[in-house]
C-alpha cells in the first residue's frame, strides 16, 4: 500500500487548458466571443491556457473535420473530456461550468 503524498501548495504541476475558438472574422458575435474568452481565461487560468483561433471564412477544412457548423464555437481540447460551447460566450457562468473551472475556483 502506498502512503499518500503531501504536496506543498503551489508546487503541483499546473494543467494547461487548450482551447479552440471557431470564429467568422469581422462578425460582431465572433469579436464578442474572443473578448469574453480572453477575459475569462485571464481571470481564471492566468498563464495556463492556449487559444487557437480558426477563421471559418479562410480555413474550411478544420471546421468540417471538427463538425463545426455555427460560429462562434469554443472547443475545450484539453484537459479531457472535450467540451463545446456555442455562442458569444457572454454567459460567463455557463462557460466557466463547461470548462470545468467552477470545480477549481470559487466564483
Question: How would you name each of these model-derived features?
Answer:
Residues 71-83:
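A short, hydrophobic beta-strand/beta-hairpin element that forms part of a small beta-sheet core
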Residues 42-46, 104:
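Arginine/glycine-rich "motif VI" loop of SF2 helicases in the C-terminal RecA-like domain
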Residues 1-12:
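N-terminal leader/targeting and pre-domain segments
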Residues 10-43:
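Local sequence-structure signature of Cys/Sec-based thiol-disulfide redox active-site neighborhoods
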Residues 12, 51-54, 65, 77-79:
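Structured alpha-helical
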Residues 47-59:
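Thiol-based oxidoreductase modules, predominantly thioredoxin-like and allied folds used
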Residues 64-70:
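Thiol/disulfide oxidoreductase modules built on the thioredoxin-like
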Residues 89-107:
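Ser/Thr/Gly-rich flexible loops in soluble cytosolic domains mediating phosphotransfer, phosphorylation
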Amino acid at each position: 500500500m502506498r502512503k499518500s503524498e503531501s504536496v506543498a501548495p503551489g508546487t503541483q504541476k499546473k494543467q494547461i487548458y487548450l482551447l479552440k475558438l471557431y470564429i467568422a472574422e469581422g462578425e460582431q458575435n465572433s469579436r464578442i466571443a474572443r473578448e469574453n474568452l480572453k477575459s475569462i481565461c485571464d481571470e481564471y487560468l492566468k498563464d495556463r491556457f492556449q487559444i487557437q483561433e480558426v477563421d471559418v471564412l479562410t480555413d474550411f477544412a478544420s471546421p468540417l473535420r471538427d463538425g463545426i457548423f455555427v460560429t462562434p464555437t469554443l472547443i475545450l481540447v484539453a484537459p479531457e473530456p472535450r467540451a463545446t460551447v456555442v455562442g458569444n460566450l457572454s454567459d460567463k457562468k455557463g462557460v466557466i461550468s463547461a470548462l470545468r473551472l467552477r470545480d477549481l475556483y470559487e466564483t
